[in-house]
């Protein structure tokens, strides 16, 4: 059976003003700033809030390059591998799509976004003015999405502390919905003799909550309600 591999971006994009008073795009991850050239930024942006296979990255990059007429200096493979080496892209592998998804998300820390209001506003304008989509249809962008039980639990826990997907799974397994302080959190997650930050993802993978939580995290990410960090 062929091993399946999935990829996504971690961190967040910001613009900073340099010493020449010029705006420069940077990527923030784990409290550090990373510079990226145009090709790398295109690939990172392609994978931000998306989960793709290797071949999908190639197809998406080809579409963007053709549409923009941008002349590339390096291959997309070189750019992608450099981003993986720098930790700005991450991958997960497994025998099944779900195994690859869990391997990808299990150790990533989750940060809720404040809600992509301006992104939705820009999309609304684009749909109504440029694509001539009826206002009644475009208005659906602003309708509050209903979250599933597990999506709501993920957001509640992620809003209280910086937790990985695996740590959230263990919290839900232990019926923990409130995190009073860091000491109580660490005791709940790592108070036994076997669990460590290195093995928690493998230890909770077979738990009852593992699959619904992992799928909830993936869906929240694809709906741009969370971003991923690496600590």
Each model region followed by its residue ranges:
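Generic signature of intrinsically disordered, low-complexity, basic-rich segments
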Residues: 5, 19-21, 214
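Hydrophobic, helix-prone linear segments
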Residues: 1-13
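N-terminal ordered "arm"
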Residues: 10-42, 47-48
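Long, charge-rich, low-complexity alpha-helical segments
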Residues: 34-231
């Amino acid at each position: 059976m062929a091993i399946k591999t999935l990829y996504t971006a971690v961190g967040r994009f910001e613009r900073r003003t340099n010493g020449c008073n010029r705006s420069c795009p940077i990527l923030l991850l784990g409290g550090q700033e990373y510079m990226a050239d145009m090709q790398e930024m295109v690939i990172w942006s392609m994978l931000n809030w998306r989960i793709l296979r290797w071949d999908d990255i190639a197809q998406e990059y080809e579409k963007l390059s053709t549409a923009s007429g941008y002349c590339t200096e390096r291959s997309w493979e070189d750019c992608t591998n450099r981003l993986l080496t720098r930790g700005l892209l991450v991958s997960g592998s497994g025998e099944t799509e779900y195994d690859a998804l869990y391997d990808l998300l299990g150790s990533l820390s989750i940060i809720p976004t404040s809600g992509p209001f301006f992104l939705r506003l820009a999309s609304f304008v684009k749909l109504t003015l440029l694509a001539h989509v009826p206002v009644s249809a475009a208005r659906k962008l602003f309708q509050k999405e209903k979250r599933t039980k597990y999506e709501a639990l993920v957001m509640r826990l992620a809003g209280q502390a910086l937790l990985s997907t695996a740590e959230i799974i263990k919290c839900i397994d232990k019926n923990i919905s409130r995190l009073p302080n860091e000491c109580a959190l660490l005791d709940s997650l790592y108070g036994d003799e076997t669990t460590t930050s290195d093995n928690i993802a493998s230890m909770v993978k077979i738990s009852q909550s593992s699959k619904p939580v992992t799928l909830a995290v993936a869906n929240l990410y694809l709906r741009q309600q969370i971003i991923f960090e690496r600590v």
